[in-house]
Amino acid sequence: MAEATEPKEVSSGSQGQPEGAVIEGPGEPGAADLEGREASEGAAEAPRDLGEGAEAMASGKEEGGCGQDGEIGEVQAQDPRPGPGTETPGTSGAPGEAEAAECDSEGALIPQSGGGAKRQQVQGTSSGLDAQGEAPEVPEDARREPEDPKASEAGEEAESGQEALGGSAPESQINPEVQGPVGDNMDTEAPAGEPQGSEGEPQGGGESSPQPQDEAIEIAAAEVGGHEPGELAGASAADAKGEGETLRKDGFEEAAPEEARVDSGENGFEEAAPEEARVDSGENRDQGRLQEETGEEEARPESGLKGPCEEAIQEKAPDGSLDGEEAKSTGHEESQVELSNHLAEETSAQGGEELGRVNGRRENGPASEEGDLGQEHDITLFVKAGSDGESIGNCPFSQRLFMILWLKGVIFNVTTVDLKRKPADLQNLAPGTNPPFMTFDGEVKTDVNKIEEFLEEKLVPPRYPKLGTQHPESNSAGNDVFAKFSAFIKNTKKDANDIYEKNLLRALKKLDSYLNSPLPDEIDAYSTEDVTVSQRKFLDGDELTLADCNLLPKLHIIKIVAKKYRGFEFPSEMTGIWRYLNNAYARDEFTNTCPADQEIEHAYSDAAKRMK
């Protein structure tokens, strides 16, 4: 890249330092003469007589630094000082017009293209007055139509000559997602109130027409990215004029449906900071032909989906909005462009849906994943301690809740409580309450039946399995067995023992009959074989349910204590009960929550008195 050279000539306009750039369209008065001047100063190969045919054209009035008819214009900079790293047309080897200038009263994005064009941030302010205090006015017809038709042909020949010298003109477009290598990125910034020279424009000897400040203040925010890349990449003056923008009657610029606009404030001014506006002009340097308008509009949202900064935008913008320009980093500075409502409205429907899907995955990805897995709860179960004060003691109600939490698959803590030395903090936690009780996210729950209902309602699918029964009869099966056992084991009279034993056997037989009776879903209506004996593992089927968590701990106690103190065992002909117990002993949810046999025997040592 050639070094920047100091301009040899100063602006022939007002001597004051203007604050804005003047833009003249290729078809406007003075355009051909301006091209001639640039060609003579920038490239020796360009013919000098190209602009002579349009010398009689009058310079057009510009509002806010932008052509009223919306044409792509040439930019004349007032600041003769080149920005750092900026190329001058004389040394770059590819002089050309500074195209697609977009101006704003406070902050402006000016896409520029030409030979060796780089990314550049341009800050512009309101234009100054000319020597007479106001800009010369020319009728609109004179601005829109060239007086000499040869001027357009001369401009096209000049452009073709310049393209031959500088290669294919790079496309210039607003691309908020893609940022080129460091070598291709040039950010020229100036303090507020000072102008900057636009890249690719002559640094001296050019004509300029300062603008009245009153007119500049009335101009609304100029559009950003309003022109297609083809218009900014060496399109002919006639094509650029045909695709130009129209102005509203009040001076506001209307954007085409496929063009994105920058959201302006109440006064119509863009409120983005100078360093927040970025212009991408040169990413597609090898692209030599124009792209279709619809294709370009569809490509813009897709670039956001594949951009390298997609993850950085999402971290910084939790709301997941990718509809505006994303933040850019320059050196140690980071800035973010304010989102535009107009930009969101102008985004194509397909692109918007894709962005929405990306936002949903990226911003809410970890959150959605966590939501799918379910919220972790702080659960502590307090159970009765054994005789040693530490191990799990004999308590069918404690084991019932222990099994439910285990089957739910929830993370929980188990604390054994020694009733002989109950800590003061536990007495304050649940005063007057013996285990089992539970704390769920800091809330104390003491009623076993209500705890069971609460856990079934709180810990639900898809993460936590449903433990309720499908057949209501399963909930009441064996509900009288434990009461019959208690009466049997506490009886001390030998003559009454047979009566209590028969009552217990009657209750066990009823339970065995239910376990051997096939459930409705075990019977196949289309099968020729009749199912007379059930083969299910548990009360309600092949999976453990809340009914099993209630009955199995009691059956296990009956089996241990009755044999130890009364020599009573479940009859072998009760195949349903034995199948039920054997399947339960094969499950960790049951065996790992059972107290030791010695603990069970020790608990009934006093209750099971010898018969007299």
Swiss-Prot record:
InterPro entries, sorted: CLIC, CLIC_N, Glutathione-S-Trfase_C-like, Glutathione-S-Trfase_C_sf, Glutathione_S-Trfase, Thioredoxin-like_sf
Membrane topology (UniProt): Single-pass membrane protein
Expressed in which tissues: Predominantly expressed in brain, pituitary and stomach. In adult brain, it is restricted to the choroid plexus, the striatal proliferative subventricular zone and the cerebellum where it colocalizes with the D(3)R in the Purkinje cells of the lobules IX and X.
Enzyme class: oxidoreductase
Regulation of its function: Channel activity is redox- and pH-regulated. Inhibited by IAA-94.
Entry note about domains: The active G-site contains a monothiol Cys-X-X-Ser motif which mediates glutathione-dependent redox catalysis. Members of this family may change from a globular, soluble state to a state where the N-terminal domain is inserted into the membrane and functions as a chloride channel. The redox status of the active cysteine in Cys-X-X-Cys/Ser motif likely determines the capacity to adopt a soluble or membrane-inserted state. A conformation change of the N-terminal domain is thought to expose hydrophobic surfaces that trigger membrane insertion.
CDD domains attached to this UniProt entry: GST_C_CLIC6, GST_N_CLIC
Swiss-Prot/TrEMBL catalytic activity: chloride(in) = chloride(out)
Organism, scientific name: Rattus norvegicus (Rat)
Entry's localization field: Cytoplasm; Cell membrane
Protein's name in the database: Chloride intracellular channel protein 6
PTM: Phosphorylated.
Sites of Phosphoserine modification: S40, S264, S303, S321, S368
Molecular functions per Gene Ontology: chloride channel activity; D2 dopamine receptor binding; D3 dopamine receptor binding; D4 dopamine receptor binding; identical protein binding; oxidoreductase activity
Function, as annotated: In the soluble state, catalyzes glutaredoxin-like thiol disulfide exchange reactions with reduced glutathione as electron donor. Can insert into membranes and form voltage-dependent chloride-selective channels. The channel opens upon membrane depolarization at positive voltages and closes at negative membrane voltages. May play a critical role in water-secreting cells, possibly through the regulation of chloride ion transport.
Family note: Belongs to the chloride channel CLIC family.
GO cellular component, one term: plasma membrane
Biased composition (Low complexity): 84-96, 208-223
Region Disordered: start-end pairs: 1-373
Motif G-site, residue numbers: 395-398
Alphabetized UniProt keyword annotations: Cell membrane, Chloride, Chloride channel, Cytoplasm, Ion channel, Ion transport, Membrane, Oxidoreductase, Phosphoprotein, Repeat, Transmembrane, Transmembrane helix, Transport, Voltage-gated channel
Pfam family, one: GST_C_2
Subunit-level organization: Monomer (soluble state). Interacts with dopamine receptors DRD2, DRD3 and DRD4.
Ranges of biased composition (kind: Polar residues): 120-129
Bias kind Basic and acidic residues: ranges: 34-51, 140-153, 240-264, 275-303, 325-335, 354-364
Enzyme Commission number, as recorded: 1.8.-.-
Membrane-traversing stretches: 397-417
Name of the gene encoding the protein in the UniProt record: Clic6
